[in-house]
């Protein structure tokens, strides 16, 4: 059982916590240094989760769903809610229940249950489900509006169009498809008008309101209108305006696949003339704004995605990130720090407003940015992250990172991402537990209540969140606070257990409305008497990820925040609190095994791209943070502290220390840092390979040695989204930097004489892990 738990630490519930036993008071919790937080995967697949064809039974006071921790009086047909202790009567259809015949949501092993909710006959607004009516109407189809940048060179444009054709071919037949292209202007293509190509043109140089979008598309309150001058009139044009917007602009994939193929064949790169020394006019903001308005008119409150393929920076209209003058560089982190990025705040404000509109409509923005330059991911971050959108950053639309990732989005079967739509998360918790907020792909619905904390972290001030887009890998970090009242009398005095319930309603890819209910319990402990139970309940991997997410948020939102200093202080406080030592004797310092890996995580976090942002562009930093905030604990931990595997003739593949000492001339190393996978050949291995030894029959063992890391790398790549970049390099080669940058610099130019033969050194002044530990021990034991 323990072996199973270690293989799948999230279990059936998909929940991991920093502390698996909780201190009773706010003061004691603050002494624990690491925040009390839970990382939840709301719709993670697990084969043991039962599915039932009815809606959950809810407590009439706190609205928590019936669960295995409820106390049930089978004779009186009453259940007592474990969260608020309210007595609730079972409805008549539960009256056949007895001690030997209980509904599945009361089985002790089913702490997570998935319910099927009735589909509303028509959308009634964001997150409104008619849970009392019978199932009515067909399941809602998935809706996709593709937004394509035309300001690219022909080769890139060809790759992007080819990917779009493939994606539309992979969509379910009933999925609805719309198409917007943009360059200097934004073009909405009327796919329902098959006689000839018909587009609605929007100026790219000025902001356009939702009402203006609807009016120009003929979807506004005034309804029908004559076409704008210059647009072609078809012979059935008068009848065409009798169609709804859905029939005109959004068609089933099976009906419009041929039309879009023809359209893409004819579509050219942006033909607007560009003067020498000037950037192309690219109106990204207007195009996404128009797509948002179109979906808002046709499908408010129903799951839909805007899939944007962008090949460069916005230089026209709202959302502009750089001027058209090529001599002006794109903003850097230094510019943002000095407030020297003239377009940044205005563009960020524009996308914040767009994020609010998308959240209110229940729609998702997915961003596929492929360019050697920045495209504005940093400014768009709110619109992508708050709607639960996917983001992929690559160098080219022809690169495998984009092509394979884009294909994965639309694939079905085991390899699919399990994309779902229009989700709402609700959290109920025991008295004296307060919710500070969530870091991750969601948006606060501002639903106040007694469980809302005064302090806010991330998306807070609520007990309900909108998740316009979510998938089976989506992970959220929920931060909790304890009420400042003394809990000696309550809740622990009455009940030593605390309860948390996570309820996620969502629309799956087939259009069915489901609700997953997860109820977990943990124990209160009095840490004033002993910290032993607290220590045993510490999850250091989860704690490292939570601290990384919190540090990233603080770097974004707090001016002048020094992440390295904050991480160091927290680590010293944690080691002082939970380490075993004699005061002022560093040699006596030891850490419990439950804490022993945490300093190493912190060391690697300090050196990672999440903290050392000045080596990256603002777009890369925003991309890295969005991935960190949405991935599960195991994947996020690999982003912070990559895994290293060594391959040699003498032994089977085995984990290696993330240290420069692991490099050997006769070894191959495989580094997994999540967004890149590096296969690194030692000097001797590379020489033998270049001489072609692997092609000789007597050297089959060498051929197998070369193949093994490549096969393992492909296994990692197949299981991951976005698809990581594969780097194959040799010792002392130019691309060896991808490995060296992640290794502990135990051997540098300062102590090169101590290194082993065939090993390597790192040219850096960074401290090594060993020196870091020495300083930590010294500071942790100080009086």
From Swiss-Prot:
Source superkingdom: Eukaryota
Subcellular location: Cytoplasmic vesicle, COPII-coated vesicle membrane; Endoplasmic reticulum membrane; Membrane
Keywords: Cytoplasmic vesicle, Endoplasmic reticulum, ER-Golgi transport, Membrane, Metal-binding, Protein transport, Transport, Zinc
Subunit and interaction comment: Component of the coat protein complex II (COPII), composed of at least five proteins: the Sec23/24 complex, the Sec13/31 complex and Sar1. Interacts with SEC24A.
Zinc finger-like, as annotated region: 59-84
Protein name: Protein transport protein SEC23 B
UniProt gene name: SEC23B
Membrane topology: Peripheral membrane protein
Binding of Zn(2+), residues: 59, 62, 81, 84
GO terms classed as biological process: COPII-coated vesicle budding; intracellular protein transport
Annotated GO MF terms: zinc ion binding
The family this protein is said to belong to: Belongs to the SEC23/SEC24 family. SEC23 subfamily.
Role: Component of the coat protein complex II (COPII) which promotes the formation of transport vesicles from the endoplasmic reticulum (ER). The coat has two main functions, the physical deformation of the endoplasmic reticulum membrane into vesicles and the selection of cargo molecules.
Keyword Metal-binding appears in the UniProt entry: yes
Gene Ontology, cellular component aspect: COPII vesicle coat; endoplasmic reticulum membrane; extracellular region
Keyword Kinase: no
SUPFAM superfamilies registered for this protein in UniProt: beta-sandwich domain of Sec23/24, C-terminal, gelsolin-like domain of Sec23/24, Helical domain of Sec23/24, vWA-like, Zn-finger domain of Sec23/24
